[in-house]
C-alpha cells in the first residue's frame, strides 16, 4: 500500500488525537464519537472526520471509533514504536529547560546528545544527557546517526550551524531562533518563535476579542496544506 500523502494541517493534529486517545484508553473507554473527540481536543467534528478519511474507514457509522484500534493505528502512523534520538544545539536557558523536560511523557523521543561552545558545560552531563563541544558536532551526529536537531543558539551563528547539521545528514530541524534558516529541499524545518507566537496571541485578543469562536482554537481547525 502506497504511503498516504496528507495535508500539513492534518499532520499537525495527529499527535493531538493520539494523546487524547491514550487518555481514553487509560480511562477504559471502549469507543468514541467524532463529536466527543471534538469537544475534548477543540477541533470541529467535520475536521476530525476529514482528517481520518485520509486513512480510509477508521470508524463505523452509528458506532463511532474503537479507541484501542484507533490508538494502535495512530501509534503506527506516528512511529511511536521507534525511539528517535534528537540533538540539542545550544545549552543556554532554553536549552537547559528542554534538557530537563526531555520529552519524558513521550517515550519514543529523547534528547540523546547536546552541544555548546561554553567550555564550562562541554564534556559534562546535564540532566542525564552528555554535552559535547561544538567542534565535535558533525562527528557525533554522524557516529550516533542522529537525524533530528533542535536549535537554541544565537542568530549570529545559526546559519553556520545549520550548514554543519546539513553536512552531518540531519533531516529535520526544530528552530527556536527568530531567524529563518536556509536548507536544502531534503531538510524539513519547524520554526518555533515564542515571541512571535505571543505577539500573535496579543494581536488576536486586541483586535478580534470573542470573534475567534467559543474556544479560540481556530488554528487547530485549519485545513490548508
Curated annotation (Swiss-Prot):
Subcellular location: Cytoplasm
Record has Repressor as a keyword: yes
Ligand binding (NAD(+)): 90-95
Main function: Modulates transcription in response to changes in cellular NADH/NAD(+) redox state.
Transit peptide is among the record's keywords: no
Signal peptide annotation: none
UniProt entry keywords in alphabetical sequence: Cytoplasm, DNA-binding, NAD, Repressor, Transcription, Transcription regulation
Assembly, per entry: Homodimer.
Stored InterPro entries: CoA-bd, NAD(P)-bd_dom_sf, Rex_DNA-bd_C_dom, Tscrpt_rep_Rex, WH-like_DNA-bd_sf, WH_DNA-bd_sf
DNA-binding region: 16-55
Entry's family note: Belongs to the transcriptional regulatory Rex family.
Organism: Lactiplantibacillus plantarum (strain ATCC BAA-793 / NCIMB 8826 / WCFS1) (Lactobacillus plantarum)
GO annotation terms (biological process): negative regulation of DNA-templated transcription; response to redox state
Gene: rex
Recorded GO CC terms: cytoplasm
Pfam families found in the cross-reference section: CoA_binding, Put_DNA-bind_N
One function term, GO molecular function aspect: DNA-binding transcription factor activity
Protein name (Swiss-Prot/TrEMBL): Redox-sensing transcriptional repressor Rex
